[in-house]
């Protein structure tokens, strides 16, 4: 069964890691409205563009989503 993007992203959390994807994961954890059961790129991207003030660049989301897709193919 395919896991949601959020579930994958939570595997990247690390409060001591200052890499952009880890920081994105740390901040998304505290976002009560994050679409936790979603895996669709367009819907996630739209949500983050409107609500992801903690995300300094959408390129970070793109990188995290690419890693998510790779993990789903493994």
Swiss-Prot record:
UniProt cross-references to Pfam families, sorted A to Z: YozE_SAM_like (PF06855)
Family: Belongs to the UPF0346 family.
Protein name (record): UPF0346 protein LCA_0996
Species the sequence originates in: Latilactobacillus sakei subsp. sakei (strain 23K)
